[in-house]
Amino acid sequence: MKTLIARHKAGEHIGICSVCSAHPLVIEAALAFDRNSTRKVLIEATSNQVNQFGGYTGMTPADFREFVFTIADKVGFARERIILGGDHLGPNCWQQENADAAMEKSVELVKEYVRAGFSKIHLDASMSCAGDPIPLAPETVAERAAVLCFAAESVATDCQREQLSYVIGTEVPVPGGEASAIQSVHITHVEDAANTLRTHQKAFIARGLTEALTRVIAIVVQPGVEFDHSNIIHYQPQEAQPLAQWIENTRMVYEAHSTDYQTRTAYWELVRDHFAILKVGPALTFALREAIFALAQIEQELIAPENRSGCLAVIEEVMLDEPQYWKKYYRTGFNDSLLDIRYSLSDRIRYYWPHSRIKNSVETMMVNLEGVDIPLGMISQYLPKQFERIQSGELSAIPHQLIMDKIYDVLRAYRYGCAE
């Protein structure tokens, strides 16, 4: 990460796409997409997804590292070209506990990430815990971030410390996505970004972390990009110019969250304006969902009724029976809920792919379609971009490759924006 940031600060148009997903097909796609390039791939896990207690994936940081490395070995992607990152590392998962208990868990969380070889660490202690004022004072946020940084430094080996980099600050909304419709978004004021940096510098120095400050490579701000279930707020470069100019006088770049669904031109403009780390998650699993839904429609027409997977019906049944991952985000009417379950840009379906019933139905569908020749006309109907690539000889009409290429479409836009 440090080399890439140095190149950007030296005036080169270069950025990196941060892949925030634990889905094996998304990780496979991210690695396969850059297999034949010289670029490194940044893959990040969030604190609620992967932590010392397993998170919602059931994986510890060490488990996630091995999970990613196993996929890399399968794809033929060199492990040393993977940068592992930890996102929103702090009390996010334990906000219902008092600050002392939540920070104790957060300290162990950060230590486990660093021990497992994660080298990009987002120190985010911005969340109020039980009994805390809302919002927290910037000084409190910075002091807690310094505690987390001290924890990281305390377990890092000399070799790890050379690679270790920190990201500070946070965006609005909190991690997890918008829970309601958005019409506009608050762009971070330069004064607030400067205050975030100033308070963190003061807190780090007070804890004897002066050297660690040199490892702070980025600050998270809101550049004016966001999405909810059916709306996308697109980047307006002119609105972010004060931020773009301010960061030029620092050693850092910006990290932009929720950049999903922006245009490829917007990604290029974001990187030009020093938002050099672009995080993406739901857009990748949304593309995966689109591909699976398209293949399910093809299966419906090609496979005998008694042999069909019933994939779409299974997904719907499971999500309606177990609504905990979408209930507080989606609309309440039955028809509206179904539309959001299927098509929301926030893609809460991503939490359900590991469910045994859904996983088995998708596997059945894939086996069914691997056993037949899919007519080109059907691919044109349901996956038109992939049809064009089949026609030009770039792609084969194999279900797995069709899914990969659908995810590549998202990665292609980021590659354009981050181009070396």
UniProtKB/Swiss-Prot annotation:
Pathway: Carbohydrate metabolism; D-tagatose 6-phosphate degradation; D-glyceraldehyde 3-phosphate and glycerone phosphate from D-tagatose 6-phosphate: step 2/2. Belongs to the GatZ/KbaZ family. GatZ subfamily. Keywords: Galactitol metabolism. It comes from the Bacteria. The gene is gatZ. It comes from Escherichia coli (strain K12). Component of the tagatose-1,6-bisphosphate aldolase GatYZ that is required for full activity and stability of the Y subunit. Could have a chaperone-like function for the proper and stable folding of GatY. When expressed alone, GatZ does not show any aldolase activity. Is involved in the catabolism of galactitol. This is D-tagatose-1,6-bisphosphate aldolase subunit GatZ. One of its GO terms (biological process) is phosphoenolpyruvate-dependent sugar phosphotransferase system.
